[in-house]
């Protein structure tokens, strides 16, 4: 950035001085009807926004510049935010012409985590800022949504857990102390995938005192956040960042809650991704996810609340039961659902309207929308209070108490106000007598002048009297010479002309002032009245926040009941046991997208219990699931995880019957993907996720594993899969669904009492294979991979060759090098050296090493040999023969 030199114009010096205070932001500098950018900002913005880069002359130099129209700035700001930039908005804070240089100030700084504009925000997604306070081995975190005023704080052990919580929330931006370890903070930000800001360490200090002062309470005990020094430090820093960037006191943040993992079902990033809760694995779309299926909400806050429940399922039986009671009542009452939907429809986004108004960024249209929403609350409250479920009645009660504010706003704000204050017409007629008079003058100034002229003619008897105007004298009364003797003594002479004289009266001067300054006074008075209304809203912020919370809750409950009623879901039994019993369960998303409709879905039972639970004797704790590709193993396992998640978020489930013993964590290891950016192969990703499961799963966890070990050699893969299964059975003892193509793992059931074998049934009809999609007791004997390849459309000659190779492999045919005779036909043509050999020789001379292997095989007691031991022996023999 160039030095602030006298060579620059006053305006450019003003720009440079402002830019120096915001070096990490792109400065939008208001010049008339445009926001202009200069120097490096212009170069950066023109490239990011694909707008024309021009230049401004400064002596012999050219200053790079670009600009965007003032009225279209929001869209450009949104695009810069998407690319991770901050934008400082520098506005004109006085009317041009009042001084040589218009006064300008930064009115707000828009960052990825500090967005209030409803045209930039996704109405159905929260916009979280994550503030982090680091200590040795422990971290405090705070989540703040500036657009709704929600503030939560908590503490976690270890950076891995911290990253997981930040990613679960979907934070848009991170804030760290300037005193924090830079490398550690950078690693956390990189893992979370969010831009980070470093703030003065003082913003993290004296946190409890500052929070008490902001919230106006003598103690934080009532919020349940005591004993969290790091969490409170992060919360104080988040509030400071909000106040600094928005240039306003965040009065809408009137409470703080504890961000606790003790009473929620934990879902790590891999699990959320694998279960496709909010984004599909293919393409990262919303359509095709569980959230898209469940979201039948009427309001945007309801949609955000539903997403929150999906991210944070419960482990508190009482809270789960209360939600289920409400969903059950609405599911069985179609008329009540329709009444509730109709009552919710006129309720705008109270949370975000309140935030914009309190922070000084709202306009008259926001006030009108707020008035309309508040006016609709009594009817909504009546619908909810008429219900039987406690959660519904409580929500209705929390909507009361805002009737006076609603009436005040409705009486004050015009029905269809303009977008900006300066356009005028934001206040209703009748709200302010002073404003009504000013507006009348502004709208009918000529009529007022004509009325005064007529009145003075009648009073004086001067028939030729005229009220005229010029720029020098303003309004005046003009009297011809023959009538000068009729001029009253209270008139004041201003000018003598050839034909007569010009006068003014006190009334005319008053009227002149009113008429000439009416527009300016109207704008100023409307601004004062608007500010008074804004302050009235801010004074009721706590009640509005409470009502907004109730609206969101009622809408989310309605959405769950709509889905349950339309799709035939049932109320799950959620208890303190360690059993999982799903009878005729269905995958909610898969059944919804079947071309032949949900009736075509084949339901399945999943019955499993932790190793030490009474139900384990019947169900088992570890289900080894085998079966061909495409038969539906992965779908059934995901279905079980989703049924648990739905039940613990308080929703009905797609099943004929479901009993869910509380689960503390769901782990899934499904699918395979490289992490090339971090130099990790598919197998490394698989092993890292598996290690996390083995280290963190408890007896109450649900573990879903699909094809563990397939990313390496067969022997290594089987060995790892076997050992992982043993650990989950012997050490963890949790409910585990373990799908595999390693049929050797079926032998675990002989050695481990809580292991059960299941397979997905198939039927062979001639040379065709029909997948029945049904889990049955027992193990699979074949994988039917070639049949799946046929379905995928592989050429016939490739399929024929594959069958030939498969027969060779199954017969253990090997060539003289000890390898399966995969290219037998070609090698025959090559000469006698490729003749088919027996498994242990059969050539001209016996191999001593092969003879030793054969001798060892003959000595084995097959009935006492474990599969894992057999694999180890095979590996040793192979090595001795190489």
Curated annotation (Swiss-Prot):
SMART domains associated with the record: MUTSac (SM00534), MUTSd (SM00533)
Biological role stated in the UniProt entry: This protein is involved in the repair of mismatches in DNA. It is possible that it carries out the mismatch recognition step. This protein has a weak ATPase activity.
Protein name listed in UniProt: DNA mismatch repair protein MutS
Keywords: ATP-binding, DNA damage, DNA repair, DNA-binding, Nucleotide-binding
CDD domains xrefs: ABC_MutS1 (cd03284)
GO biological process: mismatch repair
Keyword ATP-binding: yes
Signal sequence residues: none
